[in-house]
Amino acid sequence: MAKISGLCVFKWYPLYAYQCPATGPSVQLKYSAMTPRHNNNVNHVYNGPDIQWEDESLRPPPAPRLFSRSSYASYASKASKRSFYSYTSSCFEADDERSDTLSFADWITTTMSGRMSPANAGDNSDSYPYGDDTDGDSSSGLPPPRYPGDDTRPTSQKELAGWYAYAFAAEVYVICGIGSFIPILLESLARENGVLLSDRSKPCGSSSDKHTTSAEGQCVVYVLGMEINTASFAMYTFSVSVLLQALLVVSISCAADHGNFRKKLLLAFAWIGSACVMAYIFISKSTYLIGALLAIISNTSFGASFVLLNSFLPLLVRHHPEIDQVGDYGSPGYATTEEGDDEDDEYQEDSTRNSTTALLGSRRYEEGEPLSRVQTTEELTSRELELSTQISAKGIGIGYIAGLFLQCVAIAILITLKNTTWSQRIVLCVIGAWWAIFTIPAAMWLRPRPGPPLPTKSNTGGIRALFHYTIYAWKSLFRTIHLARRLVDIVLFLAGWFLLSDAIATTSSTAILFAKTQLHMEPWALGMINVISTASGILGAFSWSFISRKFRLKAHQTILACIALFELIPLYGLMGYLPFVQAWGVGGLQQPWEMYPLAAIYGFVLGGLSGYCRSLYGELIPPGSEAAFYALYAITDKGSSVFGPAIVGAIIDASGEIRPAFWFLAAIVGTPALFIWFINVERGRTEGEALAEIIEGFKMNGQNGLNGNGADGLADDRRGSDASRAILGRYDDEDEE
């Protein structure tokens, strides 16, 4: 506190100041210590507007800006608009990450520091608490960016919460919507518009009637002049939706990989899909084809949004604090366990330094400072894969918890409203509302994580820019396919995933239709199948990591164990063809209750496959090409699902029943094991990083440090990161052959 004599009061506080008027009596001020830069107990004389200084070097820093009521109001107004900015700003950043919407303490601190520091006395720009995000200055504590706008800030807990929030919002659609009530509703609406196969003059009865399993009870409906079995109507609808989904994710992959569109597109598809699901409340018997159209749009939007969500996973892992603390900026092979002195501190040479000191790299170590070994590439790969699996499995588990809760709510609605199509439409409306509402936290907390800028010859906008992005995306896809052929483990994974994802999607829809049409289960009983499956999925999502550690299984070995359990489902259905099993009257899916233990197996297996496949593939992707390679992942996933439901639908049309489709399911479930068996994660990661250097023309951040090249290599990395590099932009396939 200042020692004051006279009428003028001049107080210094950490957050505000009241200045003396421009005129007034001379005031003798005795400054107390404010910063280490100023001496204590120095007398200064205040004479009106100017201060007489005996020594100009003792002049204190400029007074901070007056923090008035208007400043409070300005901050309150800015804080009240945070959520609105999250949806409308060009950056679409999380509230706590926006430089213009800092927290109260950060705003005050950066404002005061910018005005009180003599070094910044002439700088009127707003401070950024996370450091400069463009120059890669090591003083900011952040890794140097690989391209302009690269967000190298560590992954925060709020950002992870935003990623989990979207899984919590959208998984209910695939569990309760497309995996349960949408195929049930589509089959019911098609049957209400269909006629009997044996007598086309008679309308179909309810699918719960026992005679519908016979040839006389089969029901057909005419769609665009084609005769389709009502049980296969939903299967064909899904085939069309995944075909469009595959085309869509390719077209948006460029916009997701380049620029700042990844998060915007995710939210756009989320709200389009949720709106379509809520629109089922208006669907009736006469508009059943519109119901199929809503299923196509919603499923396409869901798939596209999840491709974009998956593309965040490698970025969250790469910038996670547990990965960043490896010590890339330390000496080769070793890193200190504690942070050294600040760069502004004067380095005092120690008399104990000798000829070996120069070998320690560019960092300065105090005598006796403990050293710890930096992780090798193989250890880092193992740690990143473990962290990726944990995050992925946790996201799956959170989504399953949401699906389980909403499935119980749906069953209560169905029982209360007597299992009518109206009750099914209400359930779907609730599912869509859930999807839309819980997407809001993801919009607020998830960072955009922009990619490299797209190389363009001129500044284009509007429709021309959209057309340019789409054309570039398809060109990039073919380049990505060409590049993926060089990555043995990527090829092996995608070949296995092509069949495995088809088996997952087709088994779910086939089982629901089999239970409804062959076992004559009520909608609430069908909902119980999903409740059991979802509960088992939660258990599987959190149990497979324990199982893999207990038996020391690698990621691809855990996937093989899941496939082995998965194969039991179609094999059990085929047991119904055995004469002695038919004589028992139970077993081989002859009784409705048999669906429940199989649902438990399916959910437990899916809980492991969903997390491990996604994280395993993420480790094999060349850094910087996440959205492009996840688009290829989605094409393999959803593109294969075009064939599965269509083949099952053709089997139903040809045979009049669903059980023969289990032969097809048994084949596509078991075959992927042949490809997954030969995957080597360490080899795939090394090849991916090497390919990333060819694609983007840069060395991975910290790679030279890990390999022992020291400060010189790090300086080269920093110099190489100044220029903008576009993924696949300047890559010449012919030259690399």
Curated annotation (Swiss-Prot):
<dbReference type="GO" id="GO:0006914">
    <property type="term" value="P:autophagy"/>
</dbReference>
<dbReference type="InterPro" id="IPR036259">
    <property type="entry name" value="MFS_trans_sf"/>
</dbReference>
<feature type="compositionally biased region" description="Low complexity">
    <location>
        <begin position="125"/>
        <end position="141"/>
    </location>
</feature>
<feature type="transmembrane region" description="Helical">
    <location>
        <begin position="593"/>
        <end position="613"/>
    </location>
</feature>
<feature type="compositionally biased region" description="Acidic residues">
    <location>
        <begin position="338"/>
        <end position="349"/>
    </location>
</feature>
<feature type="transmembrane region" description="Helical">
    <location>
        <begin position="524"/>
        <end position="544"/>
    </location>
</feature>
<keyword id="KW-0926">Vacuole</keyword>
<feature type="transmembrane region" description="Helical">
    <location>
        <begin position="232"/>
        <end position="252"/>
    </location>
</feature>
<dbReference type="InterPro" id="IPR050495">
    <property type="entry name" value="ATG22/LtaA_families"/>
</dbReference>
<feature type="transmembrane region" description="Helical">
    <location>
        <begin position="289"/>
        <end position="309"/>
    </location>
</feature>
<comment type="function">
    <text>Vacuolar effluxer which mediate the efflux of amino acids resulting from autophagic degradation. The release of autophagic amino acids allows the maintenance of protein synthesis and viability during nitrogen starvation.</text>
</comment>
<feature type="transmembrane region" description="Helical">
    <location>
        <begin position="426"/>
        <end position="446"/>
    </location>
</feature>
<keyword id="KW-0072">Autophagy</keyword>
<keyword id="KW-0325">Glycoprotein</keyword>
<feature type="region of interest" description="Disordered">
    <location>
        <begin position="115"/>
        <end position="154"/>
    </location>
</feature>
<keyword id="KW-1133">Transmembrane helix</keyword>
<feature type="transmembrane region" description="Helical">
    <location>
        <begin position="559"/>
        <end position="579"/>
    </location>
</feature>
<dbReference type="GO" id="GO:0032974">
    <property type="term" value="P:amino acid transmembrane export from vacuole"/>
</dbReference>
<dbReference type="Pfam" id="PF11700">
    <property type="entry name" value="ATG22"/>
</dbReference>
<feature type="transmembrane region" description="Helical">
    <location>
        <begin position="487"/>
        <end position="507"/>
    </location>
</feature>
<feature type="glycosylation site" description="N-linked (GlcNAc...) asparagine">
    <location>
        <position position="419"/>
    </location>
</feature>
<keyword id="KW-0812">Transmembrane</keyword>
<feature type="transmembrane region" description="Helical">
    <location>
        <begin position="632"/>
        <end position="652"/>
    </location>
</feature>
<keyword id="KW-0813">Transport</keyword>
<comment type="similarity">
    <text>Belongs to the ATG22 family.</text>
</comment>
<feature type="transmembrane region" description="Helical">
    <location>
        <begin position="166"/>
        <end position="186"/>
    </location>
</feature>
<feature type="region of interest" description="Disordered">
    <location>
        <begin position="327"/>
        <end position="353"/>
    </location>
</feature>
<feature type="transmembrane region" description="Helical">
    <location>
        <begin position="661"/>
        <end position="681"/>
    </location>
</feature>
<dbReference type="InterPro" id="IPR024671">
    <property type="entry name" value="Atg22-like"/>
</dbReference>
<protein>
    <recommendedName>
        <fullName>Autophagy-related protein 22</fullName>
    </recommendedName>
</protein>
<feature type="glycosylation site" description="N-linked (GlcNAc...) asparagine">
    <location>
        <position position="354"/>
    </location>
</feature>
<keyword id="KW-0472">Membrane</keyword>
<dbReference type="InterPro" id="IPR044738">
    <property type="entry name" value="Atg22"/>
</dbReference>
<keyword id="KW-0029">Amino-acid transport</keyword>
<feature type="transmembrane region" description="Helical">
    <location>
        <begin position="395"/>
        <end position="415"/>
    </location>
</feature>
<feature type="transmembrane region" description="Helical">
    <location>
        <begin position="264"/>
        <end position="284"/>
    </location>
</feature>
<dbReference type="GO" id="GO:0005774">
    <property type="term" value="C:vacuolar membrane"/>
</dbReference>
